[in-house]
């Protein structure tokens, strides 16, 4: 009788190990699926909006997702998303989140960045340059390091009679910002900054 009970327990234990192995295998396979595409959409609710970012597999299966807090709607977008190599940059109101593209893990959080109307670009070395259209910290050029540190923020471009930034580009030793000049009849111009220190250098 004792041997029979022992045999039954051994069989049950073996079955349990088998099921556990299968479950673990499925979980590992799912976790190892490669993210081939990142999507982002905005969602409205009671005059507020949020952004939902997802990492998808080649079969459009959601590997990970991230949802920002709801923010009050404004005439300029509160959010922006840039995918660069194996990173995802989520510009969310007054902060920047840098995520791992493969698993959605947050790598760095940068606070006190431009509020709305984000114009930004990221280089192959993960240096990020950003300028905001409106709101707190707008009109200042920011350079953010690969490790999520603000290296500099320039003086406001309004100090030099410019405003309403509309584009940004990094080329060689300079950062170029498309904007408008305050001169009665605003006209589109391109101004430039020293890439290393953010010093304003006038029009291109």
Language-model regions, residue ranges each:
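Structural motif
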Residues: 47-52, 94-97, 136-142, 184-191
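Repeated scaffold domains used in trafficking and secretory/extracellular systems
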Residues: 28-32, 73-83, 114-125, 160-171
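Short loop/turn segments that connect beta-strands within beta-propeller blades
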Residues: 57-60, 100-103, 145-148, 194-197
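Bacterial N-terminal signal peptides
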Residues: 10-21
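Aromatic (tryptophan-biased) beta-strands that constitute blades/sheets of beta-rich domains
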Residues: 36-40, 61-72, 106-112, 140, ...
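Sec-dependent signal peptide cleavage junction
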Residues: 19-33
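Conserved core beta-strand positions within WD40 beta-propeller blades
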Residues: 36-38, 87, 126-129, 174-176
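Recurrent small/Gly-Pro-centered beta-turn motifs in extracellular repeat architectures
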Residues: 39-43, 92, 130-134, 177-181
């Amino acid at each position: 009788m004792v041997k029979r009970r022992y045999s039954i327990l051994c069989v049950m234990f073996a079955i349990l190990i088998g099921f556990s192995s299968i479950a673990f295998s499925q979980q590992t396979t799912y976790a190892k699926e490669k993210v081939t595409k990142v999507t982002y959409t905005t969602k409205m609710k009671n005059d507020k909006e949020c952004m939902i970012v997802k990492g998808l597999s080649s079969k459009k299966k959601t590997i990970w997702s991230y949802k920002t807090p709801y923010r009050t709607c404004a005439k300029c977008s509160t959010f922006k998303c840039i995918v660069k190599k194996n990173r995802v940059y989520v510009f969310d109101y007054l902060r920047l989140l840098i995520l791992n593209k493969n698993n959605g893990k947050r790598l760095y959080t940068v606070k006190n960045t431009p509020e709305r109307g984000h114009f930004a670009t990221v280089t192959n070395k993960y240096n990020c340059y950003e300028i905001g259209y409106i709101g707190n910290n707008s009109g200042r050029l920011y350079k953010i390091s690969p490790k999520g540190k603000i290296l500099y923020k320039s003086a406001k471009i309004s100090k030099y009679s410019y405003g309403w930034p509309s584009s940004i580009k990094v080329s060689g030793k300079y950062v170029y910002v498309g904007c408008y000049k305050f001169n009665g009849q605003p006209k589109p111009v391109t101004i430039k900054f020293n890439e290393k220190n953010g010093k304003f250098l006038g029009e291109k």
